[in-house]
Regions:
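Tubulin/FtsZ superfamily GTPase core signature
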Residues: 1-248
Length: 248
């Protein structure tokens, strides 16, 4: 279990502010909205992790700050380069074909830099099959960043390595609601990364979740990177974010 202390801030930018989730269910101490280069930026502030070495955010004046940009693939070229470069994550959702998604995303890789002390390149680029999958990922990030206590301690290096796209290795992330209605298919078994999000109230059994996670993990190829987490909420569900490689 991980416990946060101090101040932390999540900044989510999007040209269309109606797509930005509020994350109010995670009870941020402050939520504000500002405009930067014509782009809406929502800021969620909450009280830095005691052991901050795993936080992949810039630290300014003692505040852990994590910057995320959400954009459609067709809008990438309209975003100023200075905005793209300062992000920790750029989330791109598909509006047409997978081939066009890959074409729009490729220029982002030339903006990436790797600091000597870091294992990944920034901004990390994540590609999604649709905007709903991207928003589900944002909710996952919001829970990890804004909730004061995490039941499952997740290393975000693992998340980036499993789901971020790289030059010549573009992954497209789709969403499935395993509980209550969908099932994994034979095609899903070939994904390269899977994030399983178990949600439920205080009655949710950790032992039961571990069993479910183990059973679902057997549905994937042994080489797949599988991450699972627990989010406390009123409704019980299991959501899967699945990353498959696009032909590039």
């Amino acid at each position: 279990m991980r416990v946060y202390e101090g101040a932390r801030e999540l900044r989510i930018a999007c040209k269309h502010d109606d797509l930005l989730p509020s994350l109010r269910e995670y009870d941020p101490h402050q939520e504000t909205c500002e405009i930067e280069c014509g782009i809406s930026v929502k800021r969620f502030c909450r009280g830095t992790e005691k052991c901050g070495e795993e936080v992949l955010a810039h630290i300014e004046d003692g505040v852990d700050i994590w910057r995320i940009l959400l954009t459609a693939d067709v809008s990438i070229a309209e975003i100023p380069v200075e905005i793209l470069k300062k992000q920790d994550m750029v989330l791109v959702y598909r509006t047409n074909s997978e081939e066009q998604l890959a074409e729009y995303v490729r220029p982002l890789f030339s903006l990436q830099k790797r600091e000597p002390c870091e294992a990944v390149c920034y901004p990390a680029v994540f590609c999604f099959a649709n905007v709903d999958a991207a928003k589900e990922f944002i909710h996952f990030i919001g829970w990890q960043m804004l909730a004061d206590v995490q039941v499952i301690d997740i290393d975000f290096d693992d998340v980036i390595k499993a789901f971020a796209s790289q030059r010549g290795h573009i992954l497209c992330i789709s969403q499935k609601m395993l509980i209550p209605q969908e099932e994994l298919s034979a095609q899903d078994a070939e994904v390269q990364g899977a994030l399983l999000i178990f949600r439920g109230d205080e009655q949710l059994s950790i032992y039961e979740v571990c069993g479910q996670a183990e059973e679902l993990s057997r549905s994937f190829h042994e080489s797949a990177d599988i991450i699972w987490t627990i989010e406390m909420c009123h409704e019980r569900s299991v959501t899967a974010l699945l990353a498959k490689r696009l032909s590039d």
